[in-house]
């Protein structure tokens, strides 16, 4: 089987799960709210909720997680090894500006493409690059 066909079949197989995980992150209004900051949630409850969702997803996919006082978190493949490969992403968003004609915190499809707050920066990439 050609590699491109294998990749296409794999994407078709996992896309519903990937889309569900992205939708769960998009659904979190993770705009910084320093007035509501608290221990473990220094950026406010929205970013804390988004971090919790991302960590839950990582654990569900078999990764080990670490939360450093709500400021930063990471997920790691279990086991040991000399090599390190890191991907960096964030799951908070800036406030939704004007121009949204639908709920920005609901993943929708428009003209065959997914649309939602934080989809490209950085919720989608955070799901796709654990």
Name every feature range the model reports, one short phrase each.
Residues 124-128:
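Short amphipathic alpha-helical face segments that pack within enzyme cores
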């Amino acid at each position: 089987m050609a590699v491109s066909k294998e990749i296409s079949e794999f994407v078709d197989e996992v896309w519903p799960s990937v889309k569900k995980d992205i939708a769960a992150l998009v659904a979190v209004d993770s705009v910084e709210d320093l007035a509501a900051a608290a221990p473990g949630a220094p950026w406010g409850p929205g970013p804390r909720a988004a971090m919790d969702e991302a960590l839950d997803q990582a654990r569900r996919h078999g990764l080990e997680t670490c939360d450093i006082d709500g400021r930063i978190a990471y997920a790691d493949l279990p086991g040991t090894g000399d090599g390190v490969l890191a991907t960096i992403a964030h799951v908070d968003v800036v406030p939704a500006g004007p121009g949204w004609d639908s709920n920005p915190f609901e993943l929708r499809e428009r003209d065959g493409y997914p649309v939602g707050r934080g989809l490209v920066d950085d919720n989608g990439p955070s799901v796709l690059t654990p």
